[in-house]
């Protein structure tokens, strides 16, 4: 009987700080004490561990057992420490060998039968263990996540007995990976599925190339949602680093990560009834929200005025900083949240603001649109109207335009040009970088400033128009921003023009 030390990992946001599980067995009144700031679920592990050890045909020591989860000031939650606690008890009671424990880390929840159940946040733990050159033993069901870090680096097990057999040299564990048969079938959707709306498709191309936030405005049934769903198909796959960040966030929710297409950019479309916690993250134990699950991908908000205003306004800071900070009494938790925002809305409560179907006056339309705050609208680089198709378009077959593959090729070439010039896409350029990479001739700058005053736009909008113009120039292979690029960028300010028109009618 003595002391055993087992290495494990906690889960704090997308971080996996190390936790040392110290188990001491001594003579005295039989008891099981757990210290080190454990949550209720961790305290309950005492009963799970005892039953798992007995049902795995080991002896549970009838002595005084003290388990310390260090560091003590780090909050611990969930059943992820069941496996290391059980192994610590077996090692301290000399029922398994201790010589390999230093090179291993363990996470996993134990069933009463000794089976190891899956836990959240395995991927961040696997990355952290890899940095300190330790092998992480994970539950069988989490093997796919650990495999993203490296198949040869980590191991998975189905039961406590399997782990003990590996530590004692009786068998060698490997890393479980699901069958390739789960590979997702490639998408069959295409831009040519959409009849007409060539200006909307052009805006989609510009937004995809420069990663610009885009707002679709128009009556019901004109193709706003359909256009938004095609945006991800124009974007290149994530880099290894981006994909690992996104997968790490996904692993915190126990959503399945398909290792065969895990580099595809995420597309999240929350319902308009979503709460603030669902959208930006929260909870007693902070969990990522939709904006973090859309990290490095696309967040689509349909029927934007139907969202609560405070929920929409909570997006303002993450859109600028690229992260969300959730504060709790125990500390702050940070989640990455750099996403491309695409919104869609009807221009009035009835869906129409002009023509024979319009049934709302300018005052009620303004009241409806005021659910979107000015600072939030300011964060859209582009806003474009998607009108109803002209009469005869459907009967004549309509203009379906270019295929997704043709547009995607131009988008990828433009993005490569941006990355070669500044190391980032145009939407992420800061103020000083705009001055460096997006210079304007004096006459063009005066033209843009004049347009800015006529529309009543802010300095933030000024910078966003320049960045959109820079993207348009990149798509055309131009090194310098010219007047036509600025004019086209100003054309994508439909929301500003609508609000100015309604305000004038309401006077």
Predicted feature residues:
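Basic, amphipathic alpha-helical bundle interface domains used for macromolecular binding and assembly
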Residues: 35, 41-46, 61, 68-78, ...
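Conserved inter-motif catalytic segment of the P-loop NTP-binding fold
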Residues: 242-275, 282-283, 429-433, 439, ...
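Walker B catalytic acidic pair
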Residues: 296, 302-304, 314
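Conserved alpha-helical scaffold flanking the Walker A/P-loop in AAA+ ATPase domains
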Residues: 205, 260-261, 266, 274-299, ...
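Catalytic P-loop NTPase motifs of RecA-like helicase/translocase cores
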Residues: 113, 301-308, 351
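The Walker A (P-loop) glycine that initiates the GxxxxGKT/S ATP-binding motif of P-loop NTPases
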Residues: 218, 281, 303
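Walker A/P-loop
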Residues: 215-259, 321
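Peripheral, non-AAA+ core regions of ATP-driven protein-machinery
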Residues: 1-215, 219-226, 262, 327, ...
């Amino acid at each position: 009987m003595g002391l055993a030390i087992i290495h494990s990992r906690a889960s704090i946001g997308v971080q996996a700080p190390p936790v040392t599980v110290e188990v001491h067995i001594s003579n005295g009144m039989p008891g099981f004490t757990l210290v080190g700031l454990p949550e209720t679920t961790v305290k309950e592990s005492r009963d799970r561990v005892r039953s798992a050890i007995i049902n795995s045909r080991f002896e549970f020591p009838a002595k005084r057992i003290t388990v310390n989860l260090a560091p003590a000031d780090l909050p611990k939650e969930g059943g992820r420490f069941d496996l290391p606690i059980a192994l610590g008890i077996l090692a301290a009671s000399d029922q398994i060998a201790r010589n390999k424990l230093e090179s291993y880390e363990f996470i996993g929840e134990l069933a009463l039968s000794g089976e190891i159940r899956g836990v959240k946040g395995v991927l961040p733990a696997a990355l952290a263990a890899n940095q300190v050159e330790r092998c992480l033993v994970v539950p069988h069901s989490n093997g796919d996540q650990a495999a993203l870090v490296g198949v040869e680096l980590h191991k998975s097990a189905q039961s406590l007995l399997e782990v003990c057999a590996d530590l004692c040299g009786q068998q060698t564990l490997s890393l479980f990976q699901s069958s390739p048969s789960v590979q997702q079938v490639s998408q069959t959707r295409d831009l040519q599925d959409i009849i007409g709306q060539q200006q909307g498709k052009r805006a989609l191309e510009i937004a995809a190339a420069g990663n610009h936030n885009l707002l679709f405005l128009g009556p019901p049934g004109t193709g706003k949602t359909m256009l938004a769903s095609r945006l991800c198909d124009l974007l290149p796959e994530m880099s290894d680093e981006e994909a690992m960040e996104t997968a790490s966030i996904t692993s915190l929710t126990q959503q399945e990560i398909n290792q065969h297409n895990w580099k595809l950019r995420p597309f999240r479309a929350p319902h308009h009834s979503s709460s603030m916690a669902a959208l930006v993250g929260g909870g007693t134990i902070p969990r990522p929200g939709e904006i973090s699950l859309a990290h490095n991908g696309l967040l689509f908000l349909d029927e934007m005025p139907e969202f609560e205003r405070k929920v929409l306004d909570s997006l303002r800071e993450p859109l600028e900083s690229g992260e969300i900070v959730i504060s709790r009494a125990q500390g702050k938790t940070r989640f990455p949240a750099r996403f491309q925002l695409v919104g869609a809305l009807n221009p009035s409560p009835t869906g129409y603001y002009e023509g024979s179907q319009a049934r709302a006056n300018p005052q009620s339309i303004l009241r409806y649109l005021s659910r979107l705050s000015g600072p939030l609208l300011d964060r859209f680089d582009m806003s474009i109207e998607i009108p109803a198709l002209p009469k005869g378009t459907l009967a004549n077959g309509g203009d379906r335009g270019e295929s997704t593959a043709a547009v995607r090729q131009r988008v990828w070439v433009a993005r490569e040009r941006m990355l070669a010039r500044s190391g980032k896409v145009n939407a992420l350029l800061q103020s000083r970088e705009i001055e460096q990479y997006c210079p304007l001739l004096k006459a063009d700058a005066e033209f843009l400033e004049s347009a800015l005053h006529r529309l009543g736009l802010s300095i933030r909008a000024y910078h966003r128009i320049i960045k959109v113009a820079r993207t348009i120039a990149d798509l055309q292979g131009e090194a310098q921003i010219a007047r036509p690029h600025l004019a086209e960028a100003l054309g994508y300010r439909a929301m500003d023009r609508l609000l100015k028109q309604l305000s004038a009618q309401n006077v």
